[in-house]
Amino acid sequence: MIFLAGFLILNLFSTVKAEPILHEKYYPTGNGPFPVVIALHTSNGYKTVRKSVKGFLAAGYAVYTPDFFKRHGITHKNRFETWTKYREQIEKELIEIVQLAKSDSKINPNNVFSVGYSNGGYWASFLAAQNYVNAGTSHYGVWSWPRTHNGFPAKYFSKDSNPVLALHGDKETVQELRWVEPEINKAAKQSFKFKHRIFTGVGHSWDCKPCKKDGFNSDVTRQALDMTLTFFEENTVK
């Protein structure tokens, strides 16, 4: 149990498959119960999600950050298997994390949200589209991939889906808009609660300072967080 900058961080390490996947919990100051965000990492691994935690804590949200790679030995090299070979297993593991959060005495079980970045954007969409969380936001999320694409995450959506906000850039070199846009349109056709915003002149990983390919963009990083917080507030049970 570690206290850091006024926030309580609990590190939970799963050693057997009967336990939930590796995850960390972060709580804002106060007694709660708090709304919670399930924050989901990129294909560069679990460490990439940690930079997003501070903004949600400052807004009064607890944060759960599951590592959906470690148990399956997934790396950047075999990342496509996240959505094919291991898809159904990861679905179950993330549902279990949501259930764990809802059973946490510090959490308000009526207000659970998801946010994901790149690979994690796929899973944030899954959790909301399949009604496991109140709403989800996908930041430069995965909507398509070469050779083995199976129609997901667009296939998760239906007329009964909970709200999802997809944020994407029109200068993407990883999840190029020409491949993503048809999938976004499919999701929008299936669910009237699906919304999306395309940022002009913006590429992939806009919140990642070390990422050189598409470039860090502090303005879009801030705007994306603000839009996400507003979206969650709109879907909060009072």
What are these regions (language model features)?
Residues 83-104:
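Alpha/beta-hydrolase active-site loop
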Residues 48-66:
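Short amphipathic alpha-helix adjacent to the substrate-entry channel of hydrolases
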Residues 48, 69-88, 205-211:
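Cap/lid segment of the alpha/beta-hydrolase catalytic domain
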